[in-house]
């Protein structure tokens, strides 16, 4: 079985307008992520095309060049910025200093990942049965978890497990924080104003049918439940909301590490 990975990177001046992370940092992490030995579809501005070709040399790769203005959710940029500038929103949202509460472009990019994955599934360039999103900067977690980029990823054993669960969406959840959220039977829309993210959005996947459905559900929550109600938050919040209200469509890797946001699932996929 082939697993197709999907990733993307765009310069949105995050260091100046967001949280201080520089694009050079992301390029160094991106270079590591691009070394993963799996078929990969990569969305970038044409200015990064040669960078991608250099770091994917000899690996099965499809590069799709889109300008920032062409990404799937750029058309929502002004609408999202109007929400972020709204005083009522600022007074209600938890931790308004977060990058997703200041930069509309950040939101346009992070939510576009779901449209990108859906497109990759539809085109299925590498005839895959399973698809995974991997954040461009995820390689910064490789070394701490012992991931060897010289070995197949996911491993043969991991691919067999993924294939067996291809009718569900694979996510990682951090279980030892926010007990009121983790242990709740359902999640209501008040969570859209929360700042506590416990479902990781940097690595997730599934088979074509369930993942397409999931991406459509994210779109519905974003546009119908958040934006129409003058609210915006990050994609991790939306993923947790969908999981809690549709738990039968998910396979959850439960992470009990003492450090928040450690992607233990990265190592498991090479075991």
Task: Enumerate the language-model features and the residues they cover.
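Extended hydrophobic/aromatic segments used for targeting, binding, or gating
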Residues: 150-195, 213
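N-terminal anchoring/stem segment of glycosyltransferases
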Residues: 1-101, 108, 112, 120-127
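A structural signal for short, well-ordered beta-strand segments and their strand-loop junctions
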Residues: 6, 41-44, 64, 130-135, ...
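The feature represents the membrane-entry module of six-transmembrane cation channels
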Residues: 7, 103-112, 164, 194-200, ...
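Short, flexible/disordered intra-domain loops and linkers
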Residues: 13-24, 143-151, 226-229
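GT-A fold catalytic core of metal-dependent nucleotide-sugar glycosyltransferases
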Residues: 105, 109-171
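Short catalytic/ligand-binding loop motif for oxyanion handling, primarily in non-cytosolic enzymes
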Residues: 13-15, 49-52, 71-74, 139-144, ...
């Amino acid at each position: 079985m082939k697993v197709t990975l999907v990733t993307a990177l765009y310069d949105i001046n995050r260091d100046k307008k967001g949280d201080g992370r520089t694009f050079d940092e992301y390029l160094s992490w991106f270079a590591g992520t691009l070394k993963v030995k799996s078929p990969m579809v990569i969305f970038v501005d044409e200015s990064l095309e040669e960078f991608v070709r250099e770091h994917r040399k000899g690996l099965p790769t499809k590069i799709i060049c889109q300008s920032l203005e062409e990404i799937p959710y750029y058309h929502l940029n002004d609408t999202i910025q109007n929400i972020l500038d709204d005083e009522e929103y600022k007074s209600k949202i938890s931790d308004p200093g977060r990058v997703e509460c200041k930069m509309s472009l950040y939101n346009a990019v992070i939510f576009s990942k779901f449209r990108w994955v859906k497109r990759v599934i539809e085109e299925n360039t590498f005839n895959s049965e399973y698809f995974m999103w991997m954040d461009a900067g995820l390689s910064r977690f490789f070394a701490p978890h012992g991931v060897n980029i010289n070995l197949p990823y996911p491993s043969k054993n991991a691919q067999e497990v993924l294939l067996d669960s291809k009718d569900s969406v694979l996510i990682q959840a951090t279980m030892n924080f926010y007990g009121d959220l983790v242990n709740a039977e359902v999640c209501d829309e008040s969570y859209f104003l929360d700042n506590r993210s416990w479902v990781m959005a940097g690595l997730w996947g599934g088979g074509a049918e369930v993942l397409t459905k999931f991406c459509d559900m994210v779109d519905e929550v974003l546009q119908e439940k958040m934006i129409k109600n003058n609210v915006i938050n990050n994609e991790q919040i939306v993923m947790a909301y969908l999981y809690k209200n549709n738990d039968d469509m998910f396979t959850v890797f439960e992470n009990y590490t003492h450090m928040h946001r450690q992607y233990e699932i990265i190592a498991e996929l090479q075991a």
